[in-house]
From Swiss-Prot:
The gene is argH. It comes from Haloarcula marismortui (strain ATCC 43049 / DSM 3752 / JCM 8966 / VKM B-1809). HAMAP family: Arg_succ_lyase (MF_00006). Signal peptide: none annotated. Its main location: cytoplasm. This is Argininosuccinate lyase.
Length: 499
């Protein structure tokens, strides 16, 4: 995806060097150092699409004649059929494709590059391919959200311990826990959709950076390529890669969401609170009893790759002057690597949770550890009229007095402490049955029926909201894909007029 000053095409019969650049610098070790041809396989199809749209526009504007346009478009079809591996040597895929066209058509093949620099060509190809990757990642995330919603439906009554600082905090449910990540993935979806809007802009027609004297139609190439709009300023359009930063940032944020989920599952697995399916675990080479959550550990580890990609991209772009610098050749790979890695992580993380076994009895017992129902007892006293801070003091004293094998105080212990602090019997505020219910993790969860809480009715409402959000995002995704597909159909229809 390199670029530089464009050159006139020399004699097409000279095959010793790439057709496009043979009139200038000789070959040597630096030539291979400059080349990104191998890496550019990812944007091979994108370049062909960009070339076709550009040639159709040139012919429509009578910048090149119809016969030449037809010859070039036919040559591009041959190049596509031959594939990336058959391209001649070149600094990048763009130069190699142009050389392959000139080899087939002759010097007139060089007219394909009229009114264009590789600067705007490269930018268009990156945007074209990146939007496809974004949509694929969004589809994967949407699928993961659907899996998590199904887990929430199935486990809405499965009580589990909730933690802060990795210490037992309050009882919750598997459904409530899993929906917390589904909601985070909703926001990750939104960030990717937002990035798509700024990626899907057409830089073609900007040329090197100062536009072109030819009467090009930038809106036409935008329509043929499925771009929603034109990137307005020609210098910015050719030079900027901030859309890569925005996309990679969204991907790194998504990876961070996944790392939290992965860490939760790793910790829960270590306590016997979840049993991963064998497909998402491995054993030790020496300790046959082990069932290790390796896949989740790798999801956690790959987050570092995504963050490193973002840092690498920002470092690459830092301090680059307008308008083009070869540093940019290294920019795209940071985004591609992050996207590929995190897309796999989404699939693995969601699959691990969806296929896991959640042992209800074990989890309910664990939900009593460390007097995790303490907040519920304090809330019960507060609802009976005791100032919350006073209620907090009563329960804190009870927690401090627990023995090493005790998970929660009984009614008598709480009653004695309450009388010491309040100056009157506990029964003045709450009866025994209500207090014992508050000490029970299942009842404690049922009490927490505020919007967004873990109580079954509150979870059911969250599931409903999540399903609606999922449907809305699926619709947006389908619309984006349809727009791209329709543009491809329009482009092929126009190409067929010439070939």
């Amino acid at each position: 995806m390199s670029d530089g000053e464009d050159h006139e095409t020399a004699n097409a019969d000279d095959r010793d060097e790439t057709v496009v650049r043979r009139d200038r610098f000789a070959g040597g070790p630096a030539r291979s150092f400059l080349s990104s041809l191998s890496d550019d396989e990812r944007i091979f199809a994108a370049d062909l699409a960009v070339d076709r749209a550009h040639v159709v526009m040139l012919a429509e504007r009578e910048i090149i004649d119809r016969e030449t346009a037809g010859d070039v478009l036919a040559a591009l079809a041959d190049v596509e059929d031959a594939g990336h591996d058959a391209l001649p040597d070149g600094e990048d895929v763009h130069e190699a494709i142009e050389s392959a066209v000139i080899e087939r058509v002759g010097p007139d093949g060089g007219k394909m590059h009229t009114a264009r620099s590789r600067n705007d060509e490269v930018a268009a190809c990156i945007r074209y391919r990146l939007r496809e990757d974004i949509l694929d990642l969004i589809e994967t995330v949407v699928g993961a959200r659907e899996q998590l919603i199904e887990v929430a439906r199935a486990e809405d009554g499965t009580v589990m311990p909730g933690y802060t600082h990795l210490q037992p905090a309050q009882p919750t449910t598997v459904a409530h826990w899993v929906l917390s990540y589904e909601q985070a993935l909703q926001r990750d979806t939104g960030r990717l959709l937002d990035a798509y809007e700024r990626v899907n802009q057409n830089p073609l027609g900007s040329a090197a950076f100062a536009g072109t004297p030819f009467d090009v139609d930038r809106e036409r190439t935008a329509a043929l390529l499925g771009f929603d709009s034109v990137a307005e300023n020609s210098m910015d359009a050719s030079a900027t890669r901030d859309f890569l930063v925005e996309t990679t940032s969204a991907v790194a944020t998504l990876a961070t969401t996944l790392s939290g989920l992965a860490e939760d599952v790793v910790v829960m697995a270590s306590k016997g609170h979840v049993a991963l399916d064998d497909d998402y675990a491995s054993t030790s080479s020496i300790m046959p009893q082990k069932k290790n959550p390796d896949t989740l550990e790798l999801v956690r580890g790959r987050t570092g790759d995504a963050v490193a990609g973002l840092n690498g991209l920002l470092t690459n772009l830092k301090g680059q002057p307008r308008a083009y610098n070869r540093d940019l050749q290294r920019a795209g790979r940071h985004a591609w690597d992050a996207i590929d890695s995190v897309t796999e992580s989404v699939e693995v993380a969601a699959g691990a949770v969806a296929t896991a076994d959640w042992p209800a009895e074990t989890l309910e017992v664990a939900a009593t550890d460390g007097f995790a129902t303490a907040t519920g007892v304090a809330d019960l006293l507060a609802m009976a009229g005791v100032p919350f801070r006073t209620a907090h003091e009563v329960v804190a004293e009870a927690a401090a007095g627990l023995g090493p094998e005790e998970d929660a105080p009984d009614y008598e212990a709480l009653s004695g402490l309450a009388e010491d602090v309040l100056g009157e019997p506990l029964s003045t505020y709450v009866d025994r049955d209500a207090l014992e219910a508050a000490l029970d993790p299942t009842e404690s969860v049922a009490m927490r029926d505020s919007r967004g809480g873990p109580a079954p009715d509150a979870v059911a409402e969250q599931v409903s909201v999540a399903v609606d959000a999922l449907a809305a995002d699926r619709e947006v995704l389908a619309d984006r894909r349809q727009a791209v597909s329709q543009a491809a159909d329009r482009r092929q229809t126009e190409v067929d007029r010439y070939v």
